[in-house]
C-alpha cells in the first residue's frame, strides 16, 4: 500500500528505476538513430532481440533493490522534484521535421530510485544508441539540486518519460510512463486519471505484493507528421521478466495503445495479474460514507464494466469498503473489460482541483485468445483521494511455474467513452439510502419502524420504451436478505427507468451481500447485468435515531 500511495502522489506532482543484468546482454554494432541527445555506442535492436534479452535475463538471479541515489536527489521533496524541468530544446524528436509528437524524460530523485535506460532506434536500420543522463538535459530552477554530485554519473539513468502532441508540444503531455511499470494517458481533456501497469504480482495473496519495473525503453524515431509512435520496454522483477511492445496512437479525442508482451517466469507465482489497472474511488452516488466534503463525488472511475466471453455485459459499481475486498469474476476468453468514468457532469463533482468530470475511462480489448481465468477486482478502504484504492486485472487460470512463458496481446483505449457499448439497456447510475418507507414520503413524519436499505438503479437505452407496454420484469438475486417494495419508475429527464427495491436483513451477519439484477421482458434479457456488493452494518446499528430537538 505504501508503494501505491507513493506512486499516486508522485505522478500527480509530475503531471502539472539501476537496471539489473541487461548490460551484458547487449551487442554492439555500427550506427544508430538520428537523435542529437543519443550519445551511446550503436547496437542492433528489434523486438525479437528484446524477447531474447528478457528470456536470458530470466535465467539469471534478480539483482535486487536499486542502488542509493546521490544525497541531493534522495532527499528531495515532491515540490523540489516537480520544479525540475526537462529542456525542451533537447527533446528526443526535436530534430524531426514537421513533428507532431515529442518525448522528454523524467529526472531521477525522491522515491524514483530505479535506474531506467533510454535508447533511440532508427526503425529503418534497426540500430539503437543509448541516451545517457547528463545534467545539461534538465533545468533545475529552484529545486536546490547540487549538480556537482551528478557530474560524471552518465549511468544514473532516468525515472521515466512523457510524450507531447502538437499543438501542445512541450506544454501538455498525453502519455506518461513513470514509476515501476505504471503508465497513463489522457483523452481530449488533457486530464490524467487512472493508471495502467505492465504487470501485477501477488496483489491479493499471503505474500508481499511485488511491483515489477520497466528498466529500459527503446523508442523508434517517429516519422514526420506521424501521431503514432512505438516504444519497447524491458520488464524485470524478482519473479518474472518481460518484453513489451507499445504502439501508441495519439488521436484527437483519445489515446489508443496496442500492447504485446512476452513474459518469462523466474519462479513460481501465486497470482499473476495481466494488464492491471489502478484507480481511485472515495465516494459516489452509491457510497456516501467518505463524502463529508464540499464535493458530492470523488472518484477517478465509477464502475468496472465487463463484456464476458459468452456475450453478457456486466456493470459493477465501485465501492470504498470499510474492509479490504477482493472479488474474482470467472470468464473464458473475455471480449473486454475496463474501469470507466461515465459521469462527466461537473456539477456532480464540484471540483476545480481534481477535475474528476474530465478524467478518462480505460477499456481493454484482448487481441488474442486469453483462455480461462478471472477478472480480479480489489477495493481498498481509503479516507480520501490521495490513495489509489482500486485494482483490476486478468488472472489466467493456469498456475504459474518457474520457466513458464506467456504472450498476451491487447488494446487499451483511454477515452471519455469506451469504444463499444452494450446494445441492451445500460446502467446509468446506482444510488443507495434509507429504506422502509413509500417513495415520496422521505421518510414521513417519523422514521420507519423497521430498518431497511434502499437501492435505486437507473437504466437507459436499449429497447426499454418498447418493452414497457409488454412488461418489464426486474430479476433480482441476493446472497442473503430479502428484496421488497420493488418498483419500476419511468424517469423522464433521462428517458429511462429506475428499478428500486429495499433490502431487509434476515440475519445479524455483516458479511458482504452480493446483489445481481437484470431486466427481462417476456423471457428475454433486455439489459446488462448489474452486480453490486453491499456491506450491512452490525445488528445494533440497524435502527434509525431521531435526534431532533423540538423544544
Swiss-Prot record:
Where in or outside the cell?
Periplasm
What Gene3D superfamilies does this protein map onto?
2.70.98.10, Immunoglobulins (2.60.40.10)
Keyword Signal assigned to the entry: answer is yes
Q: In which pathway does it act?
A: Glycan metabolism; osmoregulated periplasmic glucan (OPG) biosynthesis
Q: Which HAMAP family match?
A: MdoD_OpgD
Any idea what job this protein has?
Probably involved in the control of the structural glucose backbone of osmoregulated periplasmic glucans (OPGs).
Recorded protein name is Glucans biosynthesis protein D
Gene name of the encoded protein: mdoD
Amino acid at each position: 500500500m505504501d508503494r501505491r500511495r507513493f506512486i499516486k502522489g508522485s505522478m500527480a506532482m509530475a503531471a502539472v528505476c539501476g537496471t539489473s543484468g541487461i548490460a551484458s546482454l547487449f551487442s554492439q554494432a555500427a550506427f544508430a538513430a538520428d537523435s542529437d541527445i543519443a550519445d551511446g555506442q550503436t547496437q542492433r535492436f528489434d523486438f525479437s532481440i528484446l524477447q531474447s534479452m528478457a528470456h536470458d535475463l530470466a535465467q539469471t538471479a534478480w539483482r535486487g533493490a536499486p542502488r542509493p541515489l546521490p544525497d541531493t536527489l534522495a532527499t528531495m521533496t515532491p515540490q523540489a522534484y516537480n520544479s525540475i524541468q526537462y529542456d525542451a530544446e533537447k527533446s528526443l524528436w526535436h530534430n524531426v521535421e514537421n513533428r507532431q509528437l515529442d518525448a522528454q524524460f523524467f529526472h531521477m530523485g525522491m522515491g524514483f530510485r530505479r535506474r531506467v535506460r533510454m535508447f533511440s532506434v532508427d526503425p529503418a536500420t534497426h540500430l539503437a544508441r543509448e541516451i545517457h543522463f547528463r545534467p545539461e538535459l534538465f533545468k533545475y530552477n529552484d529545486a536546490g539540486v547540487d549538480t556537482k554530485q551528478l557530474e560524471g554519473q552518465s549511468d544514473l539513468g532516468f525515472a521515466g518519460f512523457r510524450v507531447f502532441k502538437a499543438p501542445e508540444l512541450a506544454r501538455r503531455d498525453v502519455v506518461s510512463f513513470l514509476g515501476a511499470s505504471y503508465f497513463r494517458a489522457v483523452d481530449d481533456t488533457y486530464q490524467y486519471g487512472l493508471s495502467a501497469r505492465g504487470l501485477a504480482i501477488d496483489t491479493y495473496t499471503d505474500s508481499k505484493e511485488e511491483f515489477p519495473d520497466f528498466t529500459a525503453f527503446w523508442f523508434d524515431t517517429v516519422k514526420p507528421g506521424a501521431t503514432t509512435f512505438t516504444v519497447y520496454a524491458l520488464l524485470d522483477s524478482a519473479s518474472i521478466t518481460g518484453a513489451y511492445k507499445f504502439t501508441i496512437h495519439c488521436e484527437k479525442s483519445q489515446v489508443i495503445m496496442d500492447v504485446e508482451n512476452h513474459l518469462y517466469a523466474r519462479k513460481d507465482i501465486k497470482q499473476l495479474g495481466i494488464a492491471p489497472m489502478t484507480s481511485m474511488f472515495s465516494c459516489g452516488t452509491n457510497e456516501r460514507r467518505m463524502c463529508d466534503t464540499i464535493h458530492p463525488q470523488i472518484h477517478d472511475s465509477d464502475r468496472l464494466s465487463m463484456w464476458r466471453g459468452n456475450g453478457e455485459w456486466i456493470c459493477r459499481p465501485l465501492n470504498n469498503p470499510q474492509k479490504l475486498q477482493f472479488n474474482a469474476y470467472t470468464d473464458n476468453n473475455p471480449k473486454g473489460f475496463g474501469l470507466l468514468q461515465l459521469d462527466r457532469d461537473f456539477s456532480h463533482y464540484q471540483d476545480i482541483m481534481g477535475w474528476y468530470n474530465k478524467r478518462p475511462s480505460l477499456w481493454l480489448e484482448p487481441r488474442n485468445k486469453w483462455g480461462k481465468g478471472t477478472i480480479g477486482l480489489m477495493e481498498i478502504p481509503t479516507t480520501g483521494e490521495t490513495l489509489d484504492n482500486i485494482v483490476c486485472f486478468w488472472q489466467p487460470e493456469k498456475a504459474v511455474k518457474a520457466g513458464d512463458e506467456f504472450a498476451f496481446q491487447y488494446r487499451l483505449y483511454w477515452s471519455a467513452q469506451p469504444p463499444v457499448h452494450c446494445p441492451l439497456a445500460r446502467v446509468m447510475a446506482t444510488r443507495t439510502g434509507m429504506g422502509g418507507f413509500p417513495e415520496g414520503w422521505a421518510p414521513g413524519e417519523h422514521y420507519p419502524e423497521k430498518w431497511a436499505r434502499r437501492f435505486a438503479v437507473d437504466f437507459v437505452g436499449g429497447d426499454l420504451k418498447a418493452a414497457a407496454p409488454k412488461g418489464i420484469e426486474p430479476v433480482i438475486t441476493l446472497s442473503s436478505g430479502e428484496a421488497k417494495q420493488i418498483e419500476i419508475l419511468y424517469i423522464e429527464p433521462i428517458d429511462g427507468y429506475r428499478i428500486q427495491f429495499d433490502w431487509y436483513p434476515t440475519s445479524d451477519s455483516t458479511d458482504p451481500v452480493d446483489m445481481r439484477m437484470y431486466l427481462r421482458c417476456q423471457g428475454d434479457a433486455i439489459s446488462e447485468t448489474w452486480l453490486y456488493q453491499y456491506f450491512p452494518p452490525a445488528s445494533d446499528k440497524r435502527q434509525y435515531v431521531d435526534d431532533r430537538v423540538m423544544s
